[in-house]
Design a protein with these regions (language model features):
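A structural signal for well-ordered alpha-helical scaffolds and beta->alpha junctions
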Residues: 2, 21, 51-54, 100
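A solvent-exposed, acidic/Ser-Thr-rich amphipathic alpha-helical stretch
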Residues: 23, 29-79
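Short, low-complexity N-terminal intrinsically disordered segments enriched in polar/charged residues
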Residues: 1-30, 128-131
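A beta-strand edge to alpha-helix "cap/lid" segment located at domain peripheries
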Residues: 1-4, 59-131
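Hydrophobic pocket/interface hotspot
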Residues: 9-12, 24-25, 32, 50, ...
């Protein structure tokens, strides 16, 4: 039995929840369309094209964000497309001002690998925490 797109995405979140970024990367295609929408001054905002780029993307997050709570709350199955609705609580670095935001992550999965990710969250809350 083949794995579904939702199962691949759930495995990625489970790995992330364990702090297992290599486990997440194992589920990402070598060539990928990985995008995160947000303030341009944040290192994880923009478009990334390879698994190595995505590894650097994950490494950049703790430079500016201390994620204190992260909850994928709903997985919406669209065949090869999976939309995830979630929430997080983050302390902005430097300074430590905390913000909470709901987020939307949209994935495309083919052949058991994530080939596209688009992430969006409340950029106003993030900007307010950063001053």
């Amino acid at each position: 039995m083949s794995v579904t797109a939702v199962q691949v995405v759930q495995q990625a979140y489970q790995a992330f929840g364990r702090g297992d970024v290599p486990g997440v990367l194992a589920l990402v295609a070598e060539q990928v369309d990985w995008r995160f929408c947000g303030a341009r001054r944040l290192p994880y905002t923009g478009a990334f094209k390879t698994r190595a780029d995505v590894a650097r993307w994950f490494a950049s997050i703790p430079e500016v964000d201390d994620i204190q709570g992260f909850e994928p709350r709903e997985f919406i199955d669209g065949g090869d497309h999976v939309t995830v609705l979630g929430w997080e609580r983050t302390a902005a670095r430097p300074g430590g001002k905390v913000f909470e935001t709901e987020w939307v992550h949209v994935f495309t999965v083919r052949g058991g690998k994530i080939v596209r990710f688009w992430g969006m969250y409340d950029t106003e809350a993030s900007a307010a925490a950063r001053g």
